[in-house]
Every structure is written in structure tokens, then in C-alpha cells.
Design a protein with these regions (language model features):
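Glycine/small-residue-rich loop that forms an oxyanion/phosphate-binding "nest" at active or ligand-binding sites
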Residues: 1-44
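Catalytic cores of alpha/beta
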Residues: 2-12, 45-53, 70, 83, ...
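Short, small-residue-enriched loops and turns at beta-alpha junctions
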Residues: 2-5, 16-17, 64-66, 91-92, ...
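Hydrophobic faces of well-ordered beta-strands that scaffold small-molecule active sites
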Residues: 17-19, 37-40, 58-60, 82-87, ...
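Glycine-rich phosphate-binding active-site loops on the catalytic face of alpha/beta enzymes
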Residues: 21-26, 60-68, 100-125
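C-terminal helical cap(s) of enzyme catalytic domains, especially alpha/beta-barrels
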Residues: 30-35, 98, 113-137
């Protein structure tokens, strides 16, 4: 992903740029375009860089591989930020992630793994789980 991708995204109507990595070029282009920047982070160095470059939300990826305990370890030195979990987040784990400080989720496989007709129901299941978890926190 690069500056041209950001520009093309804006032309196509994007409001948010979610990137797989932390890139000063991409974050700067995103901010200059007036869009929300959500870079992928997995290490303290990537987190510090993303924040220094102006990221709005930190995309913790791959969430299921790194795990909740790792998130807590890298999140604590960087308080006051908004986090999104992506990569293998299961419906059954939503409450654990929300309690660990995750504000939102990027979902692919958990929504599309069944038939197309089931996608709306899975979206509702995730919405319900997120709201219940936030209300019980």
C-alpha cells in the first residue's frame, strides 16, 4: 500500500484507510487527504511509529495469533489510544477482546465463512456480542 492507493481510495469515496502495516507515507497521505488512518501494528516499535506519524486507530494484527495477553502487554505503555482487532477474531472471543481494550473489529472470515445468506445474521451476532460486552464492562 502506498500514497497512490490512498489517493485512489479517496477518489472512490473511502473515508477510512486500513493498511496492513505501519507506513509513514501511507499515514501522511491518509491524514493529508482528510481520511481516518488505521495502520496495522504488532510490535511496540510499530505502535510508537504509527502514533508518531498520526494514526487515528491502531489495528492489532494478527489478533488471534498474537493474543489478548500480548495486546495488553503492548497496549499498556501506550494509553489513551483506540484499538481495532483484526485477523481471526471469533464471535466467542469478542467479550475477552473488548475487556482487553479493543473498541472495534475488522472481520472477514468470521462473516463470510458460510453462505452468503448467513452474512447478515453473523453481522447481527457480532453486533449483539460487542454491545453486550460494552454494556457489561
Amino acid at each position: 500500500m502506498n500514497k497512490l492507493d490512498v489517493e485512489n481510495g479517496k477518489k472512490a469515496g473511502a473515508k477510512i484507510v486500513i493498511s496492513p502495516h505501519t507506513s509513514e507515507e501511507v499515514i501522511n497521505a491518509t491524514k493529508n487527504a482528510g481520511l481516518v488512518s488505521v495502520p496495522g501494528v504488532a510490535t511496540p516499535t510499530e505502535i510508537a511509529d504509527a502514533l508518531r506519524y498520526g494514526a487515528d486507530i491502531l489495528k492489532f494484527f494478527p489478533a488471534s495469533s498474537l493474543g489478548v495477553n500480548f495486546l495488553k502487554s503492548v497496549r499498556d505503555p501506550f494509553p489513551g489510544n483506540t484499538w481495532m482487532a483484526t485477523g481471526g477474531v471469533a464471535l466467542a472471543d469478542v467479550d475477552t477482546w473488548v475487556k482487553a481494550g479493543i473498541s472495534g473489529f475488522g472481520l472477514g472470515g468470521p462473516l463470510t465463512s458460510g453462505g452468503v445468506s448467513d452474512i447478515a445474521n453473523r453481522v447481527k451476532d457480532f453486533q449483539r456480542a460487542i454491545l453486550e460486552s460494552k454494556n457489561n464492562s
